[in-house]
Amino acid sequence: MQRVNEASIAVLNDLGTLDPTFDVQQIGLGLLLTVEIEPDDDEPTIDMMANRVLTLRCFDGPQGSLPQSVQEIRGEVLSIPQPLTSLHSPATGRPQLVAEDTDDEHANLTWIRFNEALRSGNVPVYEGRYGARMRIGSIVDGPFQFTLISD
């Protein structure tokens, strides 16, 4: 999760050009989320994590303090699905991305539910597309990067 001044996402087609069936999604001040869904994530976990995102006080206040959440600043969220992957880096120097053994349908539906939970906090939420190749742009307000874990 990154605090951003602006961010955007476009979906690419098989040729690496913009997919005309997907409207570019853009936000102003808010949060850029890269969301990984674990196989055991369930509705209570999703609700808890959405609440953490909505209430995390990570936006500036007086004298460098961080007293405000994305809800309080009336910010926006750009949510990007991140399938679980690992990088296998052999001695040959040619790394390979290896997809973890996950249920894509569960991950996609759970990610959609997570975005709905964010929206229930009265924050505008824009989305990428699960399983798609995407071009992501951002102007980070930081350096602030947060990792929220459900444990």
Describe every region a protein language model picked out.
Residues 54-58, 119, 139:
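Generic secondary-structure signature for well-ordered alpha-helical cores
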Residues 108-137:
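Short, conserved loop-to-beta-strand elements that form functional interface hotspots
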Residues 28-74, 81, 85-99, 106-113:
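Compact, glycine-rich, soluble single-domain proteins
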Residues 13, 35-37, 81-82, 138, ...:
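Flexible glycine-/small-residue-rich
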Residues 62-77, 126-139:
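Glycine/charge-rich, flexible interdomain linkers and switch-proximal surface loops
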Residues 92-103, 141-151:
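Short, low-complexity, polybasic intrinsically disordered segments
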Residues 1-9, 16-22:
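Extracytoplasmic mature domains of secreted or surface-exposed proteins
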